[in-house]
């Protein structure tokens, strides 16, 4: 999977959020966006995920132009800085939720949730509710939900 931003700009109410961004991310790579407060890091991630549409420029995934394609039509996962878990669902149910929405078979959901939870060392918390966990455990639950669906692009 590759993701390329070609001369991407984002302007909202005459304020420039992103100005002529040209970036390329290769499959399997680990990349970090670093910048001062209000530098546009979150705005850039929202553009990459498809949550926002650029004012100009193009966004390519696998070489195909996905500029303006809604997030639901992309295979993308994103964990926000202020991560969100569903408090009335167990950790297992939180992690399983994107798989259930995608119509994945019950046995496959079971396998993938346990595999992902083990990778993030939260398997022993699967029957608990998010508010019973520490902040770090809650964050790992949100990360597991993003990772379990094997998205082409995962943004943290």
In which residue ranges do the predicted regions lie?
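Conserved ABC ATPase signature
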Residues: 129-133, 137
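A short, proline-enriched helix->beta-strand linker immediately N-terminal to the Walker B motif
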Residues: 148-152
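Helix-to-loop junction immediately C-terminal to a conserved catalytic motif
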Residues: 49
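Conserved ABC transporter NBD signature motif
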Residues: 57-65
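Catalytic Walker B motif of ABC-type/P-loop ATPase nucleotide-binding domains
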Residues: 154-156
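Short coil-to-helix segment of the ABC ATPase nucleotide-binding domain corresponding to the Q-loop/switch region
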Residues: 89-98
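Conserved ABC ATPase "signature" region
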Residues: 65, 100, 107-125
